Amino acid sequence: DSISQHEDLTVVPLLVMKDGESFTDGVDVQAETVYQWIDAKHKVTTSQPSIGTFTEHYERLKEQYDIGFAIHLSSELSGTYNASVQGAEIAGFRLIAIDSRCGIYPAGQLLAEAMQLAADGMAVTEIEQYILERRFDHHIEFTVANLDQLQAGGRISSTKAFVGNLLQLRPLFHFEEGKIVPYQTVRTFKKAHGKIYDHLVEMLESGTVTDVSLFHATAYDLAFEWKTNLEKRFDVTVRIDNLTPVLGSHTGNPAIGMSFLNPTSRR
């Protein structure tokens, strides 16, 4: 949130679609409303900003800046990266665009590091190379309480969703090569989020991770319980973030996960 208010930062939101009607993520609609739509069985999907939207932003930005630096959601999840690149080309704006190969939370941390390096005087080409390497240092795990939205978004088949919900099978997800993939399946949401918590504890016990983001969809109490326990036990800063409407439309609710970037010697 602190960097989102930076005077040199422009945010181009993604879109949430409800029964074919378009809403701007975090502007026209907030996460709580999206979850209400999902509970009411509306068809909720997402869409990246149009090339034209990016073109308009970059035409405005080129009047103020010689070059732009963009970090986008994995191109395996969204067409945002490609739309951004094409929009910059049409606008004639010099842009360094990074495909983060990860989700929004590590991508935000990457952006914060890039902005700090720029403030420290590092050349933009060096920042680009650093972020291209740094983007693979992310770690993300999450799970969901039901499979309906994953099925609605095409991430699992209707058969798998039906059987999974019937047997209370809950997948644990992480990122592989920019894609969200299940790496384990357990019975019940409680066991699933317990596994993720245990994984996080194991990593914190190594003593190298000092900054963690917990993200959730209508699971704040659980996230707060994790935060309280972890900060009592470890020397770690734990943030709690609401899943954005776009991501929440894919996971459904409740959902909970964690992410962090592995430490770097530059910190």
Please place each PLM-identified region on the residue numbering.
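Mixed-charge interfacial surface used for oligomerization/domain docking
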Residues: 1-21, 63, 67, 76-96, ...
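N-terminal glycine-rich anion-binding loop in soluble enzyme alpha/beta folds
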Residues: 1-48, 53
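N-terminal, well-ordered alpha-helical segments
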Residues: 32, 36, 52-59, 82-86, ...
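Glycine-rich phosphate- or other oxyanion-binding loops that anchor nucleotides, phosphorylated ligands
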Residues: 41-75, 128, 135
